[in-house]
């Protein structure tokens, strides 16, 4: 009689519970599971776990049912995002975490975090379920269902013992990745001895672009940028960030992958530098309906305008090019912003507009909605309009 391997059981549970996208980062203990995930689901292969939190949030907001499959060490860089985005905004996310450091662990460095993970998750108020042996694997169904029914993250800590007796050979069958003999990469940029002089404040650029919006979806960076957009032009298709710095364009990527509408992210230099992996994932997935607006004033505007590396050292447009984003522009005027936006919107290709700005904030008031209320309004609008 054929016995279902635990890896196959996971795939079965994911299908039964309606998962329609997997965001993954590998672990040796689930190396036979991951090829099956790739075969059975649309997959985003992540470069950083926290980035996956943002991408999956965008996928969910646009109507999808994503799930993450990672090594448990990645939870260390995810906790703030899970708290400030998923918990605060009531965004579900089931996570299968290959639990290292607790069972026949051969790498000493895995032990400190792994041994304390249950206590850490409890202290953070994050829901988790321990799956310590193969017979407990059906609990994964409860993890997934609970995440979506209660609009929260739910983590399955899956012990290596679960896979210990498996006869699955999917990893061996998949073989090693083979680098193409010929790889064509296109990268266009220009280097000059000077830089564009800033004339506008961030609010000028935001309000200029806000006047151009029709039925586009927007995602805006936390703090003052959100407040400035709300004051300029509040729309039900605006997703406002209240935390999770660095995940603006990650959320935009998730939305763009699930929606046919143009998605615009109002990102910042500090935010992009905090999570440069976002541009790597975006360039790899290359959604044609995503326009990234990099509002670069060389400062952390919401925390006192402290200098960022973009002020003197990093050119964000060149970095976007290096990541693989081909359609870019650098502008420093309202006319330039409008021209670049209209051009890229008409092209309908992944695009990046680098806006050079002066540091400084307006006195825009706080957004008079809670994160949960703002998120609910946004998602309900997408659901009704079926974007």
Curated annotation (Swiss-Prot):
Q: Does the keyword Transmembrane apply?
A: no
UniProt keyword list:
Coenzyme M biosynthesis, Decarboxylase, Lyase, Thiamine pyrophosphate
Question: Which molecular-function annotation in GO is an example for this chain?
Answer: thiamine pyrophosphate binding
- Listed cofactors: thiamine diphosphate
Give the top-rank taxon of the lineage listed in the UniProt record for this protein.
Answer: Archaea
Instruction: Describe cofactor binding as the record notes it.
Output: Binds 1 thiamine pyrophosphate per subunit.
* Pfam entry (one): TPP_enzyme_C
Example GO biological process term?
A: coenzyme M biosynthetic process
Question: What are the EC numbers?
Answer: 4.1.1.79
- Reaction catalysed? 3-sulfopyruvate + H(+) = sulfoacetaldehyde + CO2
Pathway assigned in UniProt: Cofactor biosynthesis; coenzyme M biosynthesis
Q: Which family does it belong to?
A: Belongs to the TPP enzyme family.
Query: What functional role does this protein have?
Result: Involved in the biosynthesis of the coenzyme M (2-mercaptoethanesulfonic acid). Catalyzes the decarboxylation of sulfopyruvate to sulfoacetaldehyde. Is not able to decarboxylate the analogous compounds 2-oxoglutarate or 2-oxosuberate.
Question: What is this protein called in UniProt?
Answer: Sulfopyruvate decarboxylase
Q: Which organism is it from?
A: Methanosarcina acetivorans (strain ATCC 35395 / DSM 2834 / JCM 12185 / C2A)
Kindly list the organism's lineage. Answer: Archaea, Methanobacteriati, Methanobacteriota, Stenosarchaea group, Methanomicrobia
Gene name of this polypeptide: comDE
């Amino acid at each position: 009689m054929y016995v279902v391997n635990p890896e196959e059981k996971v795939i079965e549970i994911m299908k039964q519970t309606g998962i329609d996208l997997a965001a993954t980062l590998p672990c040796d203990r689930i190396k036979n599971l991951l090829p099956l995930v790739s075969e059975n689901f649309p997959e985003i292969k992540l470069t950083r776990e926290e980035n996956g939190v943002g991408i999956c949030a965008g996928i969910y907001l646009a109507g999808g049912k994503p799930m993450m499959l990672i090594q448990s060490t990645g939870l260390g860089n995810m906790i703030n995002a899970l708290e400030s985005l998923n918990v605060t905004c009531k965004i579900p996310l089931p996570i299968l975490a290959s639990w290292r450091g607790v069972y026949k662990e051969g790498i000493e460095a895995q032990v400190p975090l792994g041994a304390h993970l249950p206590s850490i998750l409890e202290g953070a108020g994050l829901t988790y379920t321990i799956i310590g042996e193969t017979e407990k694997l059906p609990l994964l169904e409860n993890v997934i269902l609970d995440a979506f029914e209660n609009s929260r993250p739910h983590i399955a800590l899956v012990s290596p013992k679960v896979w210990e007796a498996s006869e699955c050979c999917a990893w061996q069958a998949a073989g090693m990745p083979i680098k193409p003999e010929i790889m064509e990469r296109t990268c266009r940029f220009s280097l000059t001895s000077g830089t564009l002089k800033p004339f506008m404040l961030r609010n000028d650029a935001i309000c200029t672009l806000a006047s151009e919006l029709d039925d586009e979806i927007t995602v805006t960076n936390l703090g003052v940028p959100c407040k400035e957009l709300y004051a300029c032009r509040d729309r039900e298709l605006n997703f406002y960030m209240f935390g999770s710095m660095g995940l603006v364009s990650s959320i935009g990527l998730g939305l763009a992958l699930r929606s046919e509408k143009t998605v615009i992210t109002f990102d910042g230099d500090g935010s992009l530098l905090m999570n440069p992996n976002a541009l790597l994932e975006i360039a790899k997935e290359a959604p044609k309906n995503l326009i990234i607006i990099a509002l670069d004033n060389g400062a952390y505007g919401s925390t006192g305008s402290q200098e960022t590396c973009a002020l003197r050292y990093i050119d964000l447009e060149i970095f976007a090019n290096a990541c693989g984003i081909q359609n870019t522009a650098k502008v420093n005027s309202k006319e330039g912003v409008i021209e670049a936006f209209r051009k890229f919107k008409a092209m309908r290709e992944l695009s990046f507009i680098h806006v050079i700005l002066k540091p400084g904030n307006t006195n825009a008031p706080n957004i008079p909605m809670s994160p949960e209320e703002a998120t609910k309004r946004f998602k309900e609008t997408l659901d009704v309009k079926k974007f």
